[in-house]
């Protein structure tokens, strides 16, 4: 997560696609060309990608989705499980029903993990994959099964507890600062704070559904071209994941957004958009 640009240039009333489950996935779109689909991370929704829709829609049909349970369709999914695995399959179903695939797919943070497993399971729906600071633990050979450090889990439990007690701002500050850098929540734009507050109800459910560890065997399954993007100032756990995936993936390149932390697509959108555009152009020329 990171601070959000204004969402004013996105349509006030998004479109949506109904899934087999009866849930709807809202989305906004801009531009024409090959389908470029954006998958948000924790506390976010389609509004997170406004600078990418503004900058990349000159060449691509840009579509930003809100995953099920997230704003603006927050109430409709209350009785359905909150699951990264379901989200991965729902991205595939969205592309199939949208009808313009296969897609170039960009995922950030938790959405990067969702996009990674979508691409592994549903290769027929993906042209290329871009993972920006993908979330989830890293499995190292010869070590016990990977999970997040206990200090991280304790912090996240405290954040969820604060939110469920009604101290939403304090809980969001604790979580957002932990995945970006201390003091970041206080400096965030009103647009980002509004988006995070709109999605605060998802945080406790997310923590009860831990992301799977990245392992070399899974990465070897992923045959599409992959662009890995990290922020120069992102927390070390993201750098370690990107470094490992760069080594494990059969067809990967890496770019680092200078001066940026975890929300590099918002802090430096022109650099982020340029890296994505150059990657897609290079892949189409192959």
Feature locations, PLM:
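Conserved HGGG/HGGXW glycine-rich cap/lid loop of the alpha/beta-hydrolase fold
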Residues: 19-80, 94
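Conserved loop-alpha-helix segment in the C-terminal half of the alpha/beta-hydrolase fold
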Residues: 216-263
